Structures are given as structure tokens and as C-alpha cells.
């Protein structure tokens, strides 16, 4: 399965991405080898994810959520935690 994820950075900002392996991707971000955005905001923690059958679907969801405000992303995370 492929994943769309939201990571919370050390400065409390949110980063959206997509990947095959969530744990591996979190480790890559935390070793400074991930996205430029997260390199100066370590450590990061993946706080939300969704599974998709294809990478293109995961990336489509990533593009959609990246356009949202931080408040909308926080609401999505909170709804997920309550479930």
C-alpha cells in the first residue's frame, strides 16, 4: 500500500507527503535526508496517514491537503485521533 501522511515538526508546523513505508520515511526525515522543509525542523513525527492502492492516488490526496489551511489539517488529525 501507498500512504499519504501528515508529520508534525519540532516547531509545530505540519508537513504533508506520500510514501511506501511510513516508518522508513519518518526515519529518513529525522536523519536529515528527507525533504528540505523538515531538515531544519527535526524531529518530526507522523501524526496522520491514509492508505491508497497507487502512488498517484496518494500524491493526489497530498496535493489536495497541501492546499488546506493549518486549521483544516489540524481538524483532520483531531478527527483521526478520536476514532
What are these regions (language model features)?
Residues 1-66, 70-83:
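GIY-YIG nuclease catalytic motif and its immediate N-terminal context
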Amino acid at each position: 500500500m501507498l500512504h499519504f501522511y501528515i508529520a508534525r515538526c519540532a516547531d509545530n508546523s505540519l508537513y504533508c507527503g506520500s510514501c511506501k513505508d511510513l516508518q522508513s520515511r519518518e526515519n529518513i526525515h529525522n536523519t536529515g535526508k528527507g525533504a528540505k522543509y523538515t531538515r531544519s525542523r527535526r524531529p518530526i513525527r507522523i501524526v496522520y496517514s491514509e492508505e491508497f492502492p497507487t502512488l498517484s492516488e496518494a500524491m493526489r490526496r497530498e496535493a489536495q491537503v497541501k492546499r488546506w489551511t493549518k486549521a483544516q489539517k489540524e481538524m483532520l488529525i483531531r478527527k483521526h485521533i478520536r476514532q
